[in-house]
A protein has these predicted regions:
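N-terminal leader/linker segments that precede catalytic domains of diphosphate-processing enzymes
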Residues: 1-82, 90-107, 111-154
Length: 158
């Protein structure tokens, strides 16, 4: 039985196992080759290491630095209504991290592509966390983006 067929059966039995229509790469380790792909909504269910990008939006008006902070949608399954980076998203298997930063910047804050490309990688945060009956294993790659002081982020997705 193919993994997608198995997931469809599991979804009928467990409503928390969502389908997000975004493929994550399944690897033996972070630098390993892709063994298979799985829907992002199933990654935690199987304890699969997944990655994402988080971007700090910073303005500097020569007097003091300020950082934009987002509030997560109340409809999100994870951490609804909580504070978050200005831009954050899971890492699909079919694009690079930099391409994902540009995509997420546009979707979550209406940041133009040329401005988003100026983002600078700063490091990563990794964690493992039990969430109910699942294991959330994450590596979040952190970026900084200096924005014009006049810039106001506007969500461009749902």
């Amino acid at each position: 039985m193919a993994i997608e067929e198995m997931l469809e059966i599991l979804r009928t039995e467990d409503p928390k196992l969502s389908k997000l229509n975004e493929k994550y790469a399944v690897k033996e380790n972070i630098n390993g080759k892709t063994l298979m792909e799985i829907d992002r909504g199933a990654a935690d269910f199987f304890g699969i290491l997944n990655t994402g990008v988080h971007l700090n939006g910073i303005t500097n008006d020569h007097e003091n630095k300020k950082m934009w902070v987002a509030t997560r949608s109340h409809q999100r399954k994870t951490f609804p209504g909580e504070l978050d980076n200005m831009v954050a998203g899971g890492q699909p298997s079919n694009i690079t991290r930099q391409e994902n930063v540009v995509k997420e910047c546009f979707e979550e804050a209406s940041i133009p592509e040329e401005l988003a490309k100026a983002s600078e990688p700063r490091g990563f945060v990794s964690y493992n966390m039990q969430a109910g009956t699942t294991l959330r294993r994450k590596i979040l790659y952190v970026y900084d983006l200096y924005l014009p002081s006049s810039f106001i982020p506007v969500p461009n997705d749902n």
